[in-house]
């Protein structure tokens, strides 16, 4: 039951353990883009993050959407852009933004969706919302080898199968500064039920 799971999660947090999250079904696709009729001629083609393919399942005709988590850019050679063996993931890409306030010590950064594949979370931090430069932060599951300037974030499961992101304290990992703007991209999926797709459009 949900109550039992939340009790287990609470105990796991006490020992610094995060249970395994849902895992998105994955596949790989290859395709080309013919730029012969495109003017002016592009030097490269970029596939933007988000939904890139759809498919019907082999059982019951269930449909699914597949996404990429990051932009992918390839060069155009002889009018052809080749996307080769791109990893795609079943589910929906969601973006959530937060603004850090050092006047709110109880502030929490909770991702509001369940069904998140935690291996596919992307976290970036800017000095402020209007800044143009984004620094990528990496997931860390322990405190070993961390310095005061390590660009890392930590993760813990909270109620209703959701996840909370938190950052360093200035000793173990870099501490956020007031008005830092946090962007989190993540994927919610159907887990194992996303398997069985083989043809994509």
Question: What is the predicted function of each stretch?
Answer:
Residues 1-201:
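Signature of Asx- and small-polar-rich beta-strand/turn repeats characteristic
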């Amino acid at each position: 039951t949900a109550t039992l799971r939340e009790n287990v999660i609470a105990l796991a947090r006490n020992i610094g353990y995060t249970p395994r999250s849902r895992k998105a079904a994955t596949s790989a696709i290859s395709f080309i883009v013919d730029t012969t009729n495109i003017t002016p001629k592009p030097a490269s083609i970029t596939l933007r993050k988000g939904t890139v393919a759809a498919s019907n399942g082999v059982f019951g005709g269930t449909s699914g959407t597949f996404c990429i988590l990051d932009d992918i850019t390839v060069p155009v050679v002889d009018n052809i852009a080749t996307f080769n063996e791109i990893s795609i993931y079943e589910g929906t890409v969601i973006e959530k933004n937060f603004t850090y306030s050092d006047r709110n010590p109880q502030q929490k950064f909770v991702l509001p969706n369940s069904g998140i594949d935690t291996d596919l979370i992307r976290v970036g931090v800017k000095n402020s919302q209007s800044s143009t430069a984004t620094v990528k932060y990496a997931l860390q599951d322990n405190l070993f080898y961390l310095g005061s300037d390590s660009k890392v974030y930590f993760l813990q499961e909270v109620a209703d199968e959701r996840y909370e992101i938190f950052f360093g304290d200035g000793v173990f990992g870099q501490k956020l500064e007031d008005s830092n703007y946090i962007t989190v991209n993540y994927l919610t999926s159907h887990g194992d039920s996303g398997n069985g797709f083989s043809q994509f459009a």
